[in-house]
Design a protein with these regions (language model features):
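Carbohydrate-active catalytic/glycan-binding domains of CAZyme proteins
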Residues: 1-224
């Protein structure tokens, strides 16, 4: 489902606004939605997980301003699993950083005809990352992620760079290694001058819940 409301209202659980429920596919399920709003409506980029093949691809749903689906199309499919299609804009160009840990690397895609046509721009890191997000923080770019190494449900790392396209030779820094402060659950949110990072709760099982964490620097300039 999808609803429009301020983050502060959602946090306080005071919203009475209705949820618009989207059509449910029969042979797959949707997961990991990322939303782009524009004057004509909303685009939702998401994982389309084939139940029989047990493999995800990336699909976009186009909605009008009444949140009715007007079109949908599969936009990325590979021989390996894709999910978590984090999308961002830089210098007027849209980029996508889908989770491709099964391929032992993370690949950055560039949009050549929004929102349907994407081409591979470069391998951002030759590591099996999961749920990576990329954003500007202060005067640098931050790549925030977990690793598919058995610790992905409880540890989060980050790297910083002067460029959103160069992270290969940067230092890996541990953001958190404790229950509830875990792998990303979506894009960073800016609310009231603060940065909020949604994270997944996976203490007893995967998909247990979600929480919101304030992202800030300590006195030594380290993110936490």
């Amino acid at each position: 489902g999808i609803g429009r409301r301020k983050v502060s209202i959602t946090i306080d659980k005071l919203s009475k606004e209705p949820i618009k429920w989207l059509p449910n596919p029969t042979k797959s399920y949707f997961a990991d939605p990322f939303i782009v709003e524009h004057e004509n409506g909303v685009d939702i980029f998401l994982e389309d997980h084939d139940i029989d093949a047990q493999k995800g691809s990336i699909r976009v749903l186009r909605l009008d301003n009444e949140l009715n689906v007007t079109s949908e199309e599969k936009i990325l499919e590979t021989s390996y699993h894709l999910s978590f299609p984090f999308i961002f804009q830089h210098d007027g160009i849209w980029y996508m950083l889908p989770e491709s840990g099964a391929n032992q690397c993370v690949i950055l895609y560039e949009c050549t005809s929004y929102p349907f046509v994407w081409k591979e721009k470069k391998v951002l890191l030759n590591e099996p990352l999961t749920d990576a997000i990329l954003f500007a923080f202060d005067s640098e770019f931050v790549l925030l992620y977990s690793r598919l190494d058995g610790t992905e449900n409880r540890t989060v790392y980050y790297r910083t760079s002067a460029s959103p396209f160069e992270f290969e030779n940067t230092e890996k820094v541990l953001l958190a290694d404790q229950p509830n402060i875990m792998r990303n659950a979506g894009a960073l949110i800016k609310e009231g001058g603060e940065f909020i990072r949604p994270s997944q709760i996976c203490n007893s099982h995967y998909g247990e819940g979600m929480q919101l964490n304030k992202l800030q620097r300590d006195n030594n300039g380290v993110l936490n």
